[in-house]
Structure formats: structure tokens, C-alpha cells
């Protein structure tokens, strides 16, 4: 049985069930769950499916479930296609997802009669709309669960002032425009509650929006990114109260003071239940979870069901239905074990399957054909002017407030742009406005287009004004070569697990720190950000000094719940420092960040501490057919490459093959070892330097020179020269000669040091000379990575190199086919910054960087 939609009364189509005025009004099969007394209850004819029904004239599109499956495929396909098409323009996911949703709406394909009739009939729209709303609620819950509410109290005072100014000024300006143009608005938008809702929506920037866009732009771990998230979080906390006030105003418009009273009573009861019952339940779940494990699956299912229950309760109490999942998420202890388990178990399904239906729901209500001249003039111009004023005042107030608090101009402009980003939370607010009849579908369309345009324009501008890696390049020498002899040398040691740490400690002891030439080590443990929205960088020494303060105790809580693997690394750091405190000072850190952003913590630490080099373990690739216990984290592969590209100092990559036994670790329990230096066990270790010329090899030779003072090390330096000086750079040759001469004069009387020269014509002869060296006699191979090497010496070898982290020679001696079992150390010297820069404020503009797509995938 079928029913016809009334053509002239579109108000009967409830928006939250997915029946949009832009959809075709042709006959269609519908469910009887349409709550309107003006529409008769009808029955749907049930079809019995038959085997091979398509060959008997049966149409699968007559079934709601079959139609829903086709719709799911179309929605996800459109969004992915738009995402790929917009990637070269550096657009975040939210822009492509909204446009993909609009493609199936009346603005594009939804305006085609047959497209709606066969693929998006009303009954299937009803299913899609409800799934889309569920996607919204779970997205808000997950984002809130990653939010560190405790960071609000620890936020710097200037963040609070900037957040307040960036909200108050737009409220005053947008509110003034709204009141001045009130006579030009339709009767629904003229209400004080409606104008107030629009004003607050344009004045606040949602934390979930900032988090998702900055995550897509790889700016979560940047200074401005952290600044923006802190300011947005402060605004969101005020926004929680604004939502309650706004809902109370809408109840006052309908039911007066009596309705407002019972609404507030319901809010208090719901909030008390969440704080007194739900929060304690979460704490109990955490206490029942063994350290280092995921939360029990049954608890996760109960929490995800609780999201739906919170939606039901807030809707029943008259609150915005989104308040429930947000409040519930804020009560979840962020980070491991509960927050991280929720993210691992549900994030992919929510983001990649449920959320596309959310954007389809948004797109179905967006109809650009509503923007006609008379509609624009009579209804939409006040709303449009309010959005423009909101953007301008939000940008100017935030930027000038940041400048007042001595934030650099470039960062202030970037912060002002970030505070204008719009996204998922705003879309849900617009849908809520339709439900409350604050705006009609023309006004809703204006706000959705405002979200798309502002975010699409703002994100490239942010990239244009702000490059987080720009400060890492220093114009000062920060190298091993330029660190004076017999002075303290600083280095950053970056590790991700206990296995790689033992090899790096072995190397540090062979670097032979002494009282006269000590090492200052800044050891940072890299931990993947899980169950948290904001990156966390912990200085363990500072924590000890401030452990009596309450906020430090709160910050320590998520770390107590980390796996035992993290405790092992920190314990190893402490043990190493205790046994070598006369010649080594060590300060330990833990960096929680997304894997693709870990390099920023490493580079910022090296820059701030003015270290000579960064020491990294070589990250092996994962083998597809290997057992899970044998696999090394594939996400760490990009960390070394990013550090090599953006480093503010020299970099050493250590490939531990296990040949160098960690004698020092075994001797660490021996309290009678020398205090002047770290003596190895009485065994001689043979190191070799493959010197091919260039800055990187000069840096490697200076590091090897420090090792040569170790009485347990014999060092061989082999310099490769091209036949007839072919392909040599005169400047590099002179610099190489100077360093080699200095090294030989310094070590001429050292019987444990030898020097040789080999003349080769091409890469084949270079490789043959290396293989003829009794390669299995050497415990450590040291070489430069690539800079300044005579290309003639490597001719023919570059095509066989597979790993650019190690360079051509490093990759050759590290390969499994190479006969040596010795470990490999590859050195890259600092590339100093040439003064100047790119961007508008420097008078230069790199269009390639501006238009090139982001290299990472959106996770």
C-alpha cells in the first residue's frame, strides 16, 4: 500500500526522519512510523524473496533493505571520490565529506527524479537518517572521551584570556548585527532565543572540530596546534553552560517559567546521575583491568550502549540530544586503558561507516536552489551578514589578543584562522535548529555552505602562514664536528621500546664519555597517542620537582596505566644514569603523539636543548609472513625519515645487528668499575669508517675520533678517492683534506688507529673494495649518509639501494646479503638554515608547497 506526500505542505515532513523538502514528492513506499496526525497511517506490502528472483521479473529495489545497501555503497563511494579529487588542494576530510553528502542531495543528483525514485525513496532515507544521527552521537562521544578536561585548570593564563576575548567580542558584534537586522528576518529567526543561538554558534569554536581538522593537517603536535586546542577547549567548557541556557530559552518561548523550572530540574538530575554513578562505574572498570591490557569487551559494549541511553535521556529531558554523548564522553578516563580501548575497538567503524551517513543526512537537507533572489532578500541576507561579521570579528579578536600577549605575528594570524574552523559539531547544531524551527531549509543551506567555504578557504591559508618545521632549521652550527674537544656534548636519544634501547646504550658507551668529555643525554620515549585528543610531553625530572602539586598528580594518572613496556624503558634510563653519573647526565621524557608527528617532539627537544646530534634506532620493515611477536612497529618507519628531513642538528642512525655485545649493561651492576671512564670488558672491538667525502662523512669521522679514545676499540679509516679526481667538487675536496689531515695528525701516535686510501673508478669497484676487507672482522661500520659524496664513487650502486634512511653505502653494508654481522652507524650532518623563508610575511611564496597534497592518509 502506498501514500502520496502532500505537495503544498512541506512542513509535515519531519526533518529528523530524513524527509527533506528537496526530495521528489512522487509516490513511494513508506513506514507507518511518521508521527503526524495529518498523515494517515498506512501499511507496507511485504514481498517474499524468491531464488533467482531477478530472472522472474522481481526488482530488488522494491525492498527497503536492498535499497539501503545500494545507498550505503553510493554514499561512501561519493565521499571517497571527492576526497581523492580534493587531496591536491590540501583540503581536510570534513570538506570532502560534506560535498560528498551534498552530491546525493537535492543540490546535485538528488534533484534528478529517477535518482530519488529508485535509489533514495523516503523509506530508505528514514533508515539512512537515523544511522547518520547515530554516527554524529558516536563521533561526539569518542572525541569527548579523548578530551583531557583536567587540562583546563592547567592552561596558561594567557590562553584563558585569549579564549575569552575571542568569544566575547564576536558575541557583541554578531548580536548587534542580528538585532539591527531583526526586522528583515522571518518570524522564527526573530525570536531572542533564535538570534542568541545563531550568535553563540558563530562565536564559539568547537574542540572536536579543531581536533579533527588539525589531525588531518598534521598540526596536532605543533605549538600553534596545541595553543588552538587549548583555547577551543576552554571555549567548549563555557559552551556546555551556553547550551543549557539556550535550551532553557527555547523552553521559555514555548511553556514559560514552569517549563523552564522542570527543564532545569531534569538537567540537574541527569548531571548528578552522570557524576555520581557513571563516573564511579568508569573508575571501577579501570581498576578491574590488568595493567598493560585492553578493557574487557563486555564493558566496551555496555559503554557503547550507554551512548544510546544517554541520547534517549537527554532527548526525554528536553536537552539537545547531543549533550548526552558529550557529557558521557567527558567522564571517560582519557588515555589507556579505557579511552584507548574504546578508540581501538570502535573508531574505524564509526569514522568510516557511520559518519558517511551523517554527511548524507546533512547533504539531503542542503538545497542551493533555495537561494533565489526573493528568498535571499527576504530571509537569508541577515543570516549571511551575521556569518560574515562572525568570521571577521572572531579572526581579528583572536589574532589581536594573541599579539597583545606577545605571540609572534605569524602564529597569531594562524591562531585567528584556526578559531574560525567549522565542522561536525556545527552541522549538528544546524540540524537542531531545523528541529526547533529556528531556521528553515534555506537558512540551513546558507549555514552548511558557510561551513564548507570557511573551512575550505581557511585550511590552505593556515598552511600558507604556518609551517611547524620552519623553526627547526638553525643557522648556528649544531654538529659533532663543531663541538669543541673536552667539552660536554649534548644529544637526544629517541626510543620506542626496550629492545632498541639496549643497542643504543651499547653505542653510547662506545662513544666513551669521560669526566673531561661528558655526555648530556636527553632521552625521550615515544609512545603512540591512544585514547587522547591532545598530545602530551612529560618531563620526568620536572614532575619529580613538582610532585607535591595536585595538577602534576592528575597528569601522572594516565601514565600509571601504561603498559609495563614503558616502565621498563624508564627504569633502564634511571639505571644507566645511576651507574654513569660521573660522566653522563641524563634527563628522561615521554612523548605521547601520533606516529606521524613524533618527529616534532624529537626536533623541538633537540632545538631547545641545543644538542649536537640525535641518536635514532634503525626501524626495520615488517614482514607480512612473520609472526606477530617478530614484527616491528611499521608506524615508526616514518619517524626516522621525518627527523632526517627536519632536524635542527646532526643525526645518527644505529642499525644493531647484535654483533656488539652489551658489555656495559652486564657491568652496570659492578660497583667497582672506573669512575673516570666506562671501561669495557677486556676485549678489543674493531670499528671501520668508510670515508667517501662530503659533510656527512666528515661528521662521521669526528664521531669516530671520539670513539678512538676508547682503549678497547681499534679504528680503521678507509678513504675512497675517484680515479684521476673525476667528478670531484673542489670545495668539498679541500674540506675533506683538511678534516682527514687533522684526524691523522691527532691520531698519528695512536697504534689502535690506521688509515688507508683506495682509488676507484665507479660504484662497482667501491663495492668490491669493501667486500675485500675481511668484512666479518669488523664489529661496527661507520659512514656518512649521502651529502657531498662524489657521485662517481657511487655510480651504479644507487639503483640497488632500497633504504634511503641509511644512504647508499649504509644500506649496502646493512643488507642481509652482505657477509658482515657488524652493526652499522650512519651519520648525517646538520643542514644549516639559509636565512630567509617562504610565505607571505617573508616576501616569498613556494607555490609547490602550497598546492602539493598532504603525504599522510587520514586515519
Swiss-Prot record:
Keyword Membrane applies: yes
Phosphoserine sites (modified residues): 857
Cellular localisation: Membrane
Single GO MF annotation: antiporter activity
Topology within the bilayer: Multi-pass membrane protein
A Gene Ontology biological process term: proton transmembrane transport
Domain of life: Eukaryota
Expression sites by tissue: Specifically expressed in pollen.
One annotated Gene Ontology cellular component of this protein: membrane
Keyword terms: Antiport, Ion transport, Membrane, Phosphoprotein, Potassium, Potassium transport, Transmembrane, Transmembrane helix, Transport
Record InterPro entries: Cation/H_exchanger_TM (IPR006153), CPA2_transporter (IPR050794), Na+/solute_symporter_sf (IPR038770)
Acidic residues: bias regions: 546-557
Free-text function comment from the UniProt entry: May operate as a cation/H(+) antiporter.
Sequence similarity: Belongs to the monovalent cation:proton antiporter 2 (CPA2) transporter (TC 2.A.37) family. CHX (TC 2.A.37.4) subfamily.
Protein name: Cation/H(+) antiporter 24
Gene: CHX24
Amino acid at each position: 500500500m502506498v501514500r502520496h506526500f502532500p505537495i503544498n505542505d512541506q512542513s509535515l515532513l519531519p526533518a529528523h526522519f530524513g524527509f527533506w523538502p528537496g526530495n521528489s514528492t512522487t509516490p513511494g513506499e513508506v513506514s507507518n512510523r511518521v508521527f503526524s496526525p495529518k498523515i494517515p497511517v498506512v501499511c507496507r506490502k511485504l514481498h517474499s524473496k524468491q531464488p533467482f528472483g531477478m530472472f522472474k521479473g522481481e526488482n530488488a529495489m522494491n525492498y527497503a533493505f536492498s535499497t539501503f545497501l545500494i545507498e550505503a555503497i553510493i554514499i561512501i563511494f561519493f565521499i571517497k571520490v571527492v576526497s581523492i579529487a580534493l587531496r591536491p588542494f590540501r583540503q581536510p576530510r570534513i570538506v570532502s565529506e560534506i560535498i560528498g553528502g551534498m552530491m546525493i542531495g537535492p543540490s546535485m543528483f538528488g534533484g534528478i527524479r529517477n535518482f530519488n525514485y529508485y535509489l533514495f525513496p523516503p523509506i530508505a532515507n528514514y533508515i539512512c537518517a537515523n544511522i547518520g544521527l547515530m554516527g554524529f552521537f558516536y563521533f561526539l562521544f569518542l572525541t569527548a572521551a579523548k578530551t583531557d578536561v583536567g587540562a583546563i585548570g592547567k592552561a596558561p593564563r594567557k590562553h584563558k584570556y585569549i579564549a575569552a576575548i575571542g568569544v566575547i567580542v564576536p558575541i557583541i558584534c554578531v548580536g548587534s548585527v542580528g538585532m539591527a537586522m531583526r526586522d528583515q528576518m522571518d518570524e522564527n529567526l526573530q525570536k531572542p532565543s533564535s538570534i542568541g543561538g545563531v550568535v553563540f554558534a558563530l562565536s564559539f569554536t568547537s574542540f572536536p572540530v579543531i581536533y579533527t581538522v588539525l589531525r588531518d593537517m598534521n598540526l596536532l603536535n605543533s605549538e600553534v596546534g596545541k595553543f588552538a586546542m587549548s583555547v577551543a577547549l576552554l571555549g567548549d567548557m563555557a559552551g556546555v553552560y551556553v547550551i543549557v541556557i539556550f535550551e532553557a530559552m527555547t523552553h521559555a518561548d514555548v511553556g514559560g517559567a514552569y517549563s523552564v523550572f522542570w527543564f532545569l530540574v531534569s538537567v540537574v538530575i541527569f548531571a548528578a546521575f552522570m557524576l555520581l554513578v557513571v563516573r564511579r562505574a568508569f573508575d571501577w572498570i579501570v581498576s578491574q583491568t590488568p595493567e598493560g591490557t585492553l578493557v574487557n569487551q563486555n564493558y566496551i559494549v555496555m559503554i557503547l550502549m550507554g551512548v544510546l541511553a544517554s541520547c534517549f535521556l537527554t532527548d526525554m529531558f528536553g536537552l539537545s540530544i547531543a549533550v548526552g554523548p558529550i557529557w558521557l564522553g567527558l567522564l571517560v578516563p582519557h588515555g589507556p586503558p579505557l579511552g584507548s580501548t574504546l578508540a581501538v575497538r570502535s573508531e574505524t567503524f564509526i569514522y568510516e561507516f557511520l559518519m558517511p551517513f551523517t554527511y548524507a543526512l546533512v547533504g539531503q537537507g542542503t538545497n542551493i536552489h533555495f537561494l533565489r533572489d526573493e528568498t535571499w532578500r527576504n530571509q537569508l541576507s541577515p543570516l549571511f551578514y551575521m556569518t560574515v561579521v562572525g568570521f571577521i570579528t572572531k579572526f581579528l579578536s583572536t589574532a589581536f589578543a594573541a599579539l597583545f600577549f606577545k605571540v609572534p605575528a605569524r602564529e597569531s594570524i594562524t591562531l585567528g584562522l584556526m578559531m574560525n574552523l567549522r565542522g561536525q559539531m556545527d552541522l549538528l547544531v544546524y540540524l537542531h535548529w531545523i528541529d526547533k524551527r529556528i531556521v528553515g531549509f534555506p537558512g540551513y543551506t546558507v549555514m552548511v555552505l558557510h561551513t564548507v567555504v570557511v573551512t575550505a578557504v581557511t585550511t590552505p591559508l593556515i598552511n600558507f602562514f604556518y609551517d611547524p618545521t620552519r623553526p627547526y632549521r638553525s643557522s648556528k652550527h649544531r654538529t659533532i664536528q663543531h663541538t669543541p674537544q673536552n667539552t660536554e656534548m649534548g644529544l637526544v636519544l629517541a626510543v620506542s621500546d626496550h629492545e632498541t634501547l639496549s643497542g643504543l646504550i651499547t653505542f653510547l658507551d662506545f662513544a666513551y664519555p669521560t669526566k673531561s668529555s661528558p655526555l648530556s643525554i636527553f632521552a625521550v620515549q615515544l609512545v603512540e597517542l591512544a585514547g587522547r585528543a591532545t598530545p602530551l610531553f612529560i618531563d620526568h625530572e620536572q614532575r619529580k620537582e613538582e610532585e607535591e602539586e595536585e595538577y602534576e598528580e592528575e597528569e601522572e594518572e594516565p601514565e600509571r596505566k601504561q603498559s609495563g613496556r614503558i616502565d621498563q624503558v624508564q627504569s633502564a634510563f634511571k639505571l644507566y644514569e645511576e651507574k654513569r653519573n660521573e660522566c653522563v647526565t641524563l634527563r628522561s621524557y615521554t612523548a605521547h603523539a601520533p606516529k606521524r608527528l613524533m618527529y616534532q617532539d624529537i626536533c623541538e627537544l633537540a632545538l631547545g636543548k641545543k644538542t649536537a646530534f640525535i641518536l635514532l634506532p634503525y626501524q626495520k620493515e615488517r614482514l607480512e609472513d612473520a609472526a606477530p611477536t617478530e614484527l616491528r612497529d611499521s608506524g615508526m618507519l616514518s619517524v626516522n625519515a621525518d627527523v632526517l628531513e627536519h632536524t635542527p642538528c646532526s643525526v645518527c642512525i644505529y642499525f644493531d645487528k647484535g654483533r656488539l655485545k652489551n658489555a656495559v649493561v652486564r657491568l652496570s651492576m659492578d660497583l667497582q668499575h672506573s669512575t673516570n671512564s666506562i671501561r669495557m670488558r677486556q676485549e678489543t672491538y674493531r670499528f671501520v669508517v668508510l670515508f667517501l667525502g662530503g659533510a656527512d662523512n666528515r661528521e662521521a669521522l669526528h664521531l669516530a675520533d671520539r670513539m678512538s679514545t676508547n682503549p678497547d676499540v681499534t679504528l680503521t679509516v678507509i678513504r675512497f678517492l675517484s680515479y684521476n679526481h673525476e667528478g670531484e667538487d673542489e670545495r668539498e675536496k679541500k674540506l675533506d683534506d683538511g678534516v682527514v689531515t687533522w684526524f691523522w695528525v691527532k691520531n698519528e701516535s695512536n697504534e689502535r688507529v690506521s688509515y688507508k686510501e683506495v682509488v676507484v673508478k665507479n660504484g662497482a669497484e667501491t663495492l668490491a673494495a669493501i667486500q675485500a676487507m675481511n668484512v666479518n672482522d669488523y664489529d661496527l661500520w661507520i659512514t656518512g649518509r649521502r651529502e657531498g659524496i662524489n657521485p662517481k664513487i657511487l655510480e651504479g650502486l644507487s639503483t640497488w639501494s632500497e633504504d634511503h634512511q641509511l644512504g647508499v653505502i649504509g644500506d649496502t653494508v646493512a643488507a642481509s646479503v652482505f657477509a658482515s654481522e657488524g652493526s652499522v652507524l650512519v651519520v648525517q650532518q646538520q643542514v644549516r638554515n639559509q636565512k630567509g623563508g617562504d610565505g607571505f610575511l617573508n616576501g616569498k611564496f613556494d607555490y609547490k608547497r602550497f598546492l602539493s597534497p598532504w603525504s599522510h592518509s587520514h586515519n
